[in-house]
Every structure is written in structure tokens, then in C-alpha cells.
Amino acid sequence: MSEEKIKVSELAKEFPAVPNKDMLRALRELGASAKSMAGSLTTEEAARVREHFAEQKQADAERSGSHPNVIVRRRRKDADKADAPEVTEAAPAAREEVAPPAEEKPAAVEAPAQAEPVAEAPAASPHKVEEKAAPEAAKAEPAEKAKSSKARVVSAARVISRPGEEEEKKPEPVVESKPEPVAEISPVAAALAAREAAARAEEKSSEKGEEKGAKAARLARPDASAMPEGSSAPTLPQRAPEARTEAWKDADASAAADAAPRRAPRADGGQAPSAAPQVRIISRPAPGSQPDRSTRPAGGRPGAPGGPRGDSAGRPPRPGGPRPSGPGGPRPAGGPRPGGFGQQPAAPASPTDTRDGQSKKKRLKGRRTVDFQQGDFGGRRDDDDSQRLNRGKGRRKGGKPTSSQATQPLKAAKRKIRVTEAIRVADMAHQMGLKANEIIKVLFGLGVMATINQALDFDTATLVASEFGYEVEKAGFSEDDYLTPKEVDAPETLKPRPPVVTIMGHVDHGKTSLLDAIRKSNVTSGEAGGITQHIGAYHVKTKRGEIVFLDTPGHEAFTAMRARGAQVTDLVILVVAADDGVMEQTREAINHARAAGVPIMVAVNKMDKPSADPDRVLRELAELGLQAEEWGGDTIVAKVAAKTRMGLDDLLEMVALQSEIMELKANPDKAAKGHIVEAKLDKGRGPVATVLIQEGTLRQGDSFVCGPFSGRVRALMNDQGKKVKEAGPSLPVEVQGFEGVPEAGEEFFVVSDEKLARRIADSRAIKQRERELASESRVTLETFLSQRKSDQETLTLNLVLKSDVQGSLEAITEALLKQSTDKVRINVVHGGTGAITESDILLASASQAIIIGFNVRPTAKIKDVAEHENVDIRFYEIIYKLVDDIKSAMAGLLAPVQREVYLGQAEVRDTFSVPKIGLIAGSYVADGKIARNAGVRLLRDGVVVYTGKISSLKRFKDDAREVVKGNECGVGLENFNDVKIGDIIEAFETVEEAATL
């Protein structure tokens, strides 16, 4: 052929009505080289494709003319006489086979050899073809005319499968007796055609084998073509049975009697059984389905054109003969016929998938289609059998009925749906067994624009459910179901645990110093002003066992901290200074311990001082109800001196003895539960909380819930700053992984998974928000006027508080709010933990507030923003100084006081050790200046690490009085060597000036 090529996509434009899928299938059948729409074809291949679709188009036109109301899924052989010329053209190639196939299908003009019984005489096949192709003509004309027309059709022999195979193989008596009921076909015409076909079938009984060969060929070629030249198997799919009409059913009834005799002869012949199944196959609509039907042996198919059939002349009863005239006109192509009902196993080679795909699309359109798999063929089975087959067919083919059946039982089974506070449309549809778009339609009717992810409240869900006959149950979420233990721990699961001892007492009475002496550490020196302002938890190993100590602040502002310490402890050690006696916070600590029901031990500290008076202390304690043992009471009293370590062993001995009496036990093999001792926001690690485990074991990776926050344990660190994998009962650990900074004192629960933790946390957040909204007083005219009147008379001092830890923030807030008077009111606009940020500056500027920083410092950039916004920032490290300043400012009594003046900042870029001097910080002055006589602070991540003085300041090797911005210098700090690269050294000086507050 010529070298010219044409693209498949260009060729497809010549056939706009042909889908790409059909075009590619035709290319495969014709053996074209192109495999996709982007491929190219030779001119010869293109001509073959055009001829193929031209024949198909003509066949479709003829079929649609005779049955306009029927939709055919595959091309079929024309039953009209007009087809005869086409058939004759194709006949030469297929004629050798044609004769046998034609005989096989006297009534069902099925070309495939499998469906056709043995038919040696070619003339017989033409008659058979005519019978199918021209059923209308048969009705109007005598049987003779019908026969002659059949002869013409036979020559067309499109249906004929492989000609070679049919001749070689002896045709079995099996004749495709496809009694395709056509409404138009009259029983008489069908009977005449069937008789003639039967006679011919007898003559061709020897060609039974050909039928089988044709069947195989048909399986191999799923598509039914208009007998392309050189095609050995009929490619036309048979669809005759699908379009049944009432007339066809009548014909079936009349054919039943004749069919029985025909079947009997077949049984004698032995070939009949195979022929019978083939006849049934005729109904097969799709090429893929054809193989399936052929496979299934339909013993009752006796209607085949086989010799034995001829005697029965029952062909007429089966309307299959005239089939062509009916909607099954195209059906005459016997190709599909070989396939039995869907019941038969489909041949692997059959292209059922393609057929099914087409039929599904057409069915979805709700249009009338020809069902080739329908079970009752005229004269083939009795009415009951056909009805049963039809029912099965409907189930297989009807996608819509099946889906409705699947939904209905679900509706009937559940008439209630469960809804919490809200439910998504998708979840509601799932519970009701409906599609989401049905619910969305109802919502649109109610004026609600919703999507499948839209959440509906309980009332809306009730309205929607009522539209579908459902009731709504409110399924409230109760966290107690998950957090409250359902079973009491068995005695054998309980194991001894260390006691938790809280040290309480008045400020500066030596609580932390006593703990330092026990731990052999030096915590006090690192505390601002030498007082404790955080609650600390420490795990100590002593000669008498392990003890966990909680060190609480003694300042009056830390009432809430002391109360928390008493709640989570087993034993309270009340520290009283021998020289001071019982003070205000001592009494408060006693009340906290009694409220928590915790036993109290007394440690009389500072016994090494000359002014110590232990008897006075015992007398004052007795007045409060704490009678010492030596005075005849039951309160254990130990006399100690923290600095000289006097009496510490006796104190620990008493603690161990008391814990043994209490028999402290816990179950370590359960989900952990504990309390938040302290919480803060760390710049590098995020929200961090110190948790005291009370029962169970906390492990890395556990999901937990704490207040309105949930999280997952990312890391655990003990009181010494070392990472640990797990923590058991009575052990304090620092936990990373919170979503936010929890409130100190909150309960900490480990739950099964992160999803549950988040659900509980969200539920708590919603309830907390509802409580806040409910607590807001309703605004009335009276309350508004009274508020305005009071506002005019009262001055308000707005403050923004930033602290290093949550507990300190809480204490400062309470202490400041207590200072409010009728004339001056304190209003804390915002409080948080961590370094001062730009958003804090902007908030203070908008609310005309003063920023109070407690143990936190701003960076140089933040200072610039504050100056630009004219916001005053005050920094404090000791709470009572902060409270005193606020008091003085409120009272307007602030005479000239000392005030810090910021000098500059230097960034530590390197560190090196110098003998006899210590660690020197090689620094770069980033802002202002560093003066030799100035005070300095060492900032690490915005938090104050050290406050003191400069011991040495050098530039290169020379001492310097000051170093200005942009220069490098070496800075040595007094009594401090823990300087790290990246730290900030801030210089300041103290001056006296009038208070601006």
C-alpha cells in the first residue's frame, strides 16, 4: 500500500456518531496497527474501517426502520430482504460455512456455528435466514415466498461463524432455535419457517461439528460486524429476544406444543442437546455475552433447526422465526444466539465487558432497550420457566431496582438516629441510609444552604429527620464515661509508692533552704531576692527510701499555689522560723492543710540562730490546735537548722515513719492520672507543664487531656533536667506536648487515643465558653447608667501582665486585683506567659495600659516598638516589690524612687576561660552601650537567667570603661560562669526619678 497515513482521530471525525470506544474495538477486530486514537492507519486500513462502519450504519438504519422504538446495543444482521444483497456479497467468503449455519437456525438466523446445528445443505440455511430476516414478509406471503426470501438472506450469511470450521465439523443437530418473540410475527408464519428449517437441519445433521467451530469463532470475535470480508465468524451480536412484545408472548404459547415434539427428535439424535443450548444463545445481545450463552447447555433448546426439529415443525410456534420483523429484526444475526441465558458460564474470550458497559449507559437513560438475555423464547420453555428466567435477568441487568432494594431494608431497620450537639449532613445521611443530596434538598426547602460537611444543630436535624419518618435521639457526650475509672483497683495490683511531701510556711522562714539541705543542692541562690515564687517538685533518695518534695511559695500572693500543693500531697511539713514564730502565711498554710485533710509535721528552722526561741513557736502552734508530742499532743515537731544540717536525719526519719503508717500504694499498670504543679510557655519547647503523677504510668507518646487542652507526650524530663521514657506514681516530670499552657492545678488524664482527647478538650472548651457567656451580666438601662456614674468617679489602671510561668501570673493577678479601691481600680487587660511580644505592645497601646514584666525581658526590637507606641514597660523579679510599686502608684505616694535606665545590649558570640578570672563572654554590642559600672542581666530566650554586676570589661587586651554599639568586647560576670553562645547581656543603671505611675 502507499506510505500515506491517516490519524485515527481524523478518521473518527468522519463518523461523529461512533464513540471512540467502538472505533478502537473495530480497529482491534480488523487487525489494524493503531492501538489508540493518536495512532495512524494506512490508506488500506482506513478503507477497511470505513467499509466496516458503512455496513454497520446500513444495518442499523434497516433495523431502526422496522423497530423505531427499540434501541439496539450491537449491530445485528438485517432481517429485511434488503439485507440480502449485502449478505450475498459477504457470502462468497463465508458461503462454505454458511450453508450449515443457515440450516441450524431455521427460526433464529444465527450465523455462529455453535448455535447452528449441523446443516450440510447451504440452501437450507438461506431459508432459515429468510425466515428471520423477513418475518413480516412471511406473514403477508405464503410459506413458499418466505422460503425464497430466506434463501436470499442465507446468502448474506452474516451470522455464519467460521465457514471452514462448520464444514470441517459435523453440525450437531443442535439448531439455534431462538424463539425470539416478535410482536409483529404471526405464529403461522413462524411455524412454516420453522418446518422448512427443520427439514434442512435434518439433511445437515452431519455438519454438526461445524456449528461448534462457529461457536468458538464467535467467542473469539465479540463484535458483530456486517460480515466483513474474510471474517470467518459472525460478528453480529444477537439481540432478538430482548424486545419482547405481547404478540411474541402469544407466539411462544402457541409454539410450546410444537417445540416439545421437536425436542424429542433431538434427544434421539444425540446432537440435539448441544443444539438446544445454542438456540437459547440467540437471545444474547452483546458479543461478549454470546460466548456465555453458548457455554450453557440448554437442553430445552430443542427448537434448533436440527433435523430432528424438522419433524416437529414446531418452529412456527416459536416466534423466533419471524424474529427479524419484530424489534429483534436486527436479531436475526445468530451470532449472539449461541450464548445461552446469563445462567450459562461465559466463555473467557467473550467481550462481555464492552457490552455491559454499553447496556448500562443506555439503561441509565431509562430508555427502552432490547434485552437479549430474557429467558423465554417461543416454544422453547413453558411460561413458568420463562417467567422465572426473566425475573433472574431483571435482577442481573436492572441496576436501579437493586440499589433501591439495598436501601429499603436499611431504612426499615433503623427508625432513629443519634445526634450529639450537632451532626454533619454526611453522617446523618449515613445513619438514615440515604444519599446526602436527598437531605440537602430538604434543607434547601427549609431555607438552609448546606453541603455534605455542614453541621446541623439538634433542632434542624429533628426537622430534617421528620421529613423521612425518623426520630432523633440526643446522645450527649459525657467525659466521665472515659475518665472515671469503671473498676476499683484490685489489692494485688497496688504497689508501694513514695510519699509526696509539701513544704509550707511563711516567706523567708527557710523552706527552700531546708529542701536544699536535704537535696544537697543550691536552689535558693538562683532565686530572685532569695524567695521562692514558683512551685517546685523534687524527687529525693534518702537512706529511708524515696521522697517527693513540693516546695511552695510562702509569699501571701501565692495562696492558690499553696492550696494546690496541699491538695496533691500526702504530708505537709510546716516550716516555722524559731526567731520569728508563727506568721500570717503560717496560719494560712495550716488552714490549707486542714482543708485538704493532710497530716501536718512541724519543722522549727533556724535553731542555730542566737535569737531562736522554739518554746515560743510551740506555744503559738498550740494556740492554733497543733499540740507538740513533747507537750502531750500528736503533732510531730523536729528542730532543724538548714544551714548547718542539724536535725535533718531526725526529720527524714519521721517522714519515713509517717509514710509507712499511711501505707501509700498505687497501681502503676493503668492509664496515668495526675495534677499540673506548674506550667509555662518555653520559647524553644512550647507549652511545658510539671505534672505530678498520682496513679498509673505516664509514657512518651501517650495521648492526654488537661483542662481545655489536649496533646501527646513528646518528651518527659525529671526534676534534674534529664530525659526519661516513663514516670510512675508520685513522680514529678516535666511534660512537653500541650496545645496550650494549662492552668496550674488542672487534672491530667491519659486517654486511649488522640481523637478522644481532642473530643473531651473541645467539649470542655465549649462548656467553659458557655459559662463565661452566662456569667456576663445583662445590660439594662439602670446598670448602664450606674456604671457610667461609677466610671466617672473611678480611675482605672490598665495593666498587661507577662510572667515566666503560669503560677506566678496567677499570683500576681490576684495580688493586684486585691489592691483595687473605690477611687482606683486595677484592670488586667491581658495576662500571659513567656517573653513580651509585639502584639503585647500593640494591645497595651490600644488600651492605654502599662506592661508589667515579671522575670521576663524584651528584645531590642520590642523596646523600639514600645518607644514608638509610647508604651511604658516595667520589669520586676520579686512580687512584693511589684505590689508595693502598684500600691504607691495608685495612692499617688510615689516619691522619687529608684528606676532602671536601659543602657544597651550585647550578644554573646563566643566564650573562653581565663585562669584566675573565670569564663569570659566574647560579645558584640548590638544596641546602646555596655558600661563597666552598670548592672547587667543575662537573658536566655527572653528569660532572665542572671542579674548582677560586671566583673571585667575589656576591649582587646585593654580595660574599657564602656563599649559602644558596633564594637566587640569581653565581658566577665560576677560569680556566674554559665554563659552560652547566643545569650544576651543587657546593661542598665539605676537612677532616682519621680514615679510616673
From Swiss-Prot:
Composition bias, Basic residues: 390-399
Record has Cytoplasm as a keyword: yes
G4 as annotated region, ranges: 605-608
Domain tr-type G: 496-665
Biased composition, class Basic and acidic residues, residue ranges: 45-65, 94-107, 127-147, 163-181, 197-214, 241-252, 378-388
Region of interest (G5), ranges: 641-643
Gene Ontology cellular-component terms listed: cytosol
Region (G2), start-end ranges: 530-534
Official protein name in the record: Translation initiation factor IF-2
Species of the source: Desulfovibrio desulfuricans (strain ATCC 27774 / DSM 6949 / MB)
